[in-house]
Amino acid sequence: MSGPGPVSLRVALPWLHAAAAGAGAPDVRLPAAEWLVARGDAPVAVQAPWRTWLAGDALAPAGGLARHAAGPCLRALDGGADAGLTWAALRPVHLLTAIDHLQVAERPVHLEIDEARAIAADLGRHFAEDGYAFHVGGRRDWLLGIDRDLRCDTVAPDALPGRNLRDLMPRGEHGPAVASFINEVQMLLHEHPVNVARAARGEAPVNALWPWGYGRGVAQASLELPSLCTDDDWLVGAWRVHGSTAQGTAAPGALDSLLRGGAREVLIAWSEPAEAAVIESCCFEPLLGALVRGDVVVDLLIGDRARRIDHRARRRFWRCRRPLGEVLA
């Protein structure tokens, strides 16, 4: 009788390629990461967005990740379903002026909670008659509640930096209305007291809010899902909709504990850049340990390239470790 098969680990690090191979990347060696990349199969290009690749068929019984818009999923983290409302995520961003277009700055904007609440309160008063409600919590994205159906296709904020904003504007039935909302918010933020104070301190102003992930409130329904370890609120919210919880990524030992706990399928994602030492100790070292201990298959997505690493890696001793910047360049 055959056994249960290898443990499946799918790992997404969408930002690591740019961080390791880009100009000015730190000259830091990551032994576990280098071992895994050196001994894995040849990389394969992935066309799907990284979250879709990571989730695979896990959410297929509920229509896939495409049926789990970010807005309602983030709302689920607050314990609300609100099936009669449309929800969108709002990302505070800093826009830069290029030669002939606007683009989102690479560096994320950090707002103190009091700053965020002050901006949200003023915007809420301005847009109250339009049926918009602004919600600020402890997460990077705010929430926008809308009292009517609103349908459009939007671009997730992790795909924005450095690109022409004109090419990324919302599309679909209500795309023009959402674009008008973006422009109106920009005008309201231009001389907002929070931004005036930030500029006086030498901090980048929040001169735009990027709405994304529009969808109706999602009714919760139980679904058996793989174990999830991630810092990504959208994925955590999608799991919450179906009665599952997720582990965080940053806590020391969190992933290692999960891998040692007997799970047969684990999805792992670091959506935001992390310090080299942290990603090595909290991600790559536990993955290497799992490979050494037993029958494990790791599918590792770095940027838009996926590598498979399995039991054969232990025999590929002739493949020498090299700095990630050299391998990924």
Positions of predicted regions on the chain:
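…; additionally, a secondary subgroup of soluble metalloenzymes is captured
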Residues: 1-329
